[in-house]
Regions:
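Bacterial Sec-dependent N-terminal signal peptides
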Residues: 8-20
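Short beta-strand element of the alpha/beta-hydrolase
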Residues: 39-47
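Short beta-strand-to-loop junctions in surface cap/lid or active-site-entrance loops
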Residues: 24-38
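Serine-dependent carboxylesterase/thioesterase catalytic core
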Residues: 10, 47-48, 52-53, 57, ...
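Hydrophobic membrane-insertion alpha-helices, especially the h-region
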Residues: 1-8
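Short glycine/proline-enriched loop/turn "hinge" motifs that connect secondary-structure elements
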Residues: 34-36, 67-70
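Generic structural motif
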Residues: 16, 22-28, 144
Length: 213
């Protein structure tokens, strides 16, 4: 409901209207078959660079920690590189994919927990997956957690300091978190998200020894 109310005052940009007239074909996009019956799911969406060392490491961490506590969870990095278009379209395409995936996940009535992680341009697909799942699954839904790392918050045609994501990311989740650093050059990633718990890692000492991907 929070996301719905927030969106009432949002005026579609010219690029959003243009995208709606010629949306990206996502008809082939499907989730792993194991998600149809899994009781616990972790779904990771990469940024514009595609799957990399960081997404591989994140999946490995999920699996190792789950094994340590005996949690049976389906964990996957979803490769959506073929849908990564120009910066004026990628946010809208990400939301379209997320809406599709959320509805697919809602068909799994055994699902107990859903943890979605999005990096950079993967923010829109991640948030939309959570919101669509919550809307479709209703009262019997699973517990939903969203984790965003250095998320891009604007879609094509939006101002860098006033993007859709700043106002809405995480609105429909049981728990949403934003890992923020404020000193990089990527547009629209340096402002805390309004509806997420924010962890500002800008000054963390560990960054000095962290090799960029």
């Amino acid at each position: 409901m929070a996301l719905f109310l927030a969106s009432l005052s949002w005026s579609p940009s010219p690029l959003e209207k243009k995208y709606a007239q010629n949306p990206t074909d996502i008809s082939r996009a499907q989730l792993p078959a194991s998600f149809a019956t899994a009781e616990n799911i972790a779904l990771i969406f990469h940024g514009r660079g595609g799957p990399d060392r960081e997404t591989d490491d994140l999946k490995a961490r999920f699996l190792a920690q789950d094994a340590a506590v005996g949690l049976d969870r389906a964990v996957e990095v979803y490769n959506w590189e073929e849908y990564l278009e120009g910066t004026d379209r990628v946010g809208y395409t990400g939301q379209a994919l997320g809406r599709k995936f959320g509805k697919i996940l809602a068909q799994n009535r055994a699902l107990r927990s859903l943890h979605v992680v999005g990096t950079s341009a993967g923010s829109f697909i991640s948030d939309a997956t959570c919101s669509a799942y919550v809307a479709e699954a209703g009262d019997s839904r699973a517990c939903v957690r969203l984790s965003l790392t250095d998320p891009i918050t604007v879609r094509g045609g939006e101002e860098l300091g006033d993007g859709w994501g700043l106002r809405n990311f995480g609105a429909d989740c049981d728990f949403a978190e934003h890992y923020l650093n404020t000193d990089d050059i990527v547009p629209s990633t340096n402002i805390p998200l309004q509806r997420c718990h924010v962890y500002d890692v800008t000054g963390c000492a560990e960054r000095a020894s962290f090799p960029p991907p």
